[in-house]
Amino acid sequence: MLSEIIRIADPPLHKHLKFLNAQECMFAFRPVVVLMSRELADAEIGLLWDMLIAGGDHEPTSRANGTLAGGGARLFLHVVAAALVSMRSQVMACKKNDDLMQLVARKLPARKFTAHELVRKAMDLMKTTKGLGEAIEVASRASIALEGL
């Protein structure tokens, strides 16, 4: 979903990620797994997580058969995308995938993001990508239905 957010929000950036063979956004694995805790100052981490919880990212979604499928995490993925888009010029300067991996590993944590800044930018991105989450949810339900056949 991160790749789709970037594709809609910043097509030239997405095109460059494809050039780097990074369109699947594996470079964002660590920020996603650690919930941006290395990218923010300690005082900002709790604030970001509070905003994510207040935004409903923790609420479980369900599959067609009624079993839980995990949280939606839509706002959080838009937060990660906002951080990346904020570093657009540095990402565009990368000549290969390894450069991008190093940029995210070293420079992203050095950025002085604030939780408010990232959430504000993420909410703007959510307006731009309106309907993306619902489309992915419908595709997921269709995929689950096909598995049952």
Q: What spans do the regions from the language model cover?
A:
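Helix-rich, well-folded core regions that mediate interactions or catalysis
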Residues: 1-149
